[in-house]
From Swiss-Prot:
Gene of this entry: rlmF
Catalytic activity: adenosine(1618) in 23S rRNA + S-adenosyl-L-methionine = N(6)-methyladenosine(1618) in 23S rRNA + S-adenosyl-L-homocysteine + H(+)
Protein name: Ribosomal RNA large subunit methyltransferase F
Gene Ontology, cellular component aspect: cytoplasm
Gene3D superfamilies with a match to the protein in the record: Vaccinia Virus protein VP39
Family, similarity comment: Belongs to the methyltransferase superfamily. METTL16/RlmF family.
Keyword rRNA processing: yes
Chief place of localization: cytoplasm
Organism: Marinomonas sp. (strain MWYL1)
EC number: 2.1.1.181
Protein location: Cytoplasm
GO biological process, one term: rRNA base methylation
Function: Specifically methylates the adenine in position 1618 of 23S rRNA.
InterPro entries assigned to the protein according to its UniProt record, in alphabetical order: METTL16/RlmF (IPR010286), rRNA_lsu_MeTfrase_F (IPR016909), SAM-dependent_MTases_sf (IPR029063)
Length: 327
């Protein structure tokens, strides 16, 4: 049942900071979402502004909301992930995809390359498979998702096999070399127009716990007592932390990308912490990247960004466009 509010006060009616093509710019229409996913009705409640919402501190509510969004906006009838795996906010994931489309368009006379000719590698796809779902359903791109976790790979396979709209468009590969990012999953004949990645942010489990507690203390300081200090969006160890944290992870990716310099148009990775950019830029300079771009994205109060780099020269770019982007 969708709740009715007597309070017309609203904090914000539109998420105007999101990408112009992002379908999640407006406030969630919970009536429509509940039609797509009836079980969502059990989680709908009124927030402090009198607007319909869900308890984002409740992992089950977050997962059910994601299921409804993926059904309603992207035609995905079945979507489920095991407990404890990353359950990401859909609007932010969609933003990355749309800005990646703009990145390709900037090299293609402003026209977004669409269809199965565009190949994308999602490094660390996770069990949720969200980036490939959005990228394929929005632009028709073909995806390979890699992950070190066999459960994540199996879950992606199940999601794809359970949705006819995704079959043949998304494949998941197990990364058996945990210290590698491209080696082991990038096959000899693979050519990718894009790579994308949401890298582990923290340097260790203890650092992650400290950061979570700090944020929780900040929430309590604002007298928001309904929040709980839980990882409401989940995440396994490989999804949340690694040696060297975000800066170390992306720098390793940059170094490894040199081996695939002429087999990818744009390598990209999210960078959550602005302070990590200088180290990443230094590594990009060291490896001789020809083009480097930093694209900022705003999502509510949060500013995020991704770094993109390419090794292609002008002649290679022209050849790529003429041979791979003509639908």
């Amino acid at each position: 049942m969708v709740l009715k509010s007597k309070n017309t006060k609203s904090k914000r009616t539109n998420k105007l900071e999101l990408h112009p093509r992002n379908p999640h710019r407006a406030r969630y229409d919970f009536a429509l979402l509940a039609d797509s996913c009836p079980e969502l009705s059990g989680f709908i409640q009124l927030n402090q502004y009198g607007n319909e919402s869900v308890d984002f501190a409740n992992p089950n509510a977050v997962k059910t909301l994601n299921r409804a969004l993926l059904n309603h906006f992207y035609g995905v009838a079945f979507w489920d992930i095991p407990p404890g795996y990353l359950c990401p906010p859909i609007p932010g994931r969609a933003d990355y995809i749309h800005y990646l489309a703009d990145l390709l368009a900037a090299s293609n006379l402003g026209v977004i390359p669409r269809g199965k000719g565009v190949k994308v590698l999602d490094v660390g796809v996770g069990a949720n498979c969200v980036y490939p779902i959005i990228g394929h359903q929005e632009y028709g791109w073909q995806f390979v998702g890699s992950d070190v976790n066999p459960v994540a790979v199996a879950t992606c396979d199940t999601i794809v096999k359970s949705n006819p709209c995704l079959k043949g468009a998304i494949s998941a590969r197990l990364q058996t070399q945990s210290a590698k990012l491209f080696d082991g999953v990038w096959k000899e004949k693979d050519r990718f127009d894009l790579t994308l990645c949401n890298p582990p942010f923290h340097t260790s489990e203890s650092a992650m716990i400290d950061e979570s507690q700090r944020k929780w203390r900040g929430v309590k300081g604002k007298k928001t007592t309904t929040q709980k200090p839980v990882l409401n969006f989940g995440g396994t160890a490989a999804e949340l932390w690694c040696d060297g944290g975000e800066a170390g992870f992306v720098s390793r990716m940059v170094k490894e990308s040199v081996q695939y310099a002429d087999r990818c148009f744009w390598f990209t990775s999210l960078v959550a912490r602005q302070g990590n950019l200088d180290a990443i830029y230094r590594t990009l300079k060291d490896v001789g990247a020809r083009q480097v771009k930093t694209i900022e994205m705003a999502q509510g109060q949060k500013i995020s960004r991704f770094v993109a780099w390419s090794f292609l020269g002008d002649d290679q770019i022209d050849y790529w466009k003429d041979n791979y982007w003509q639908n």
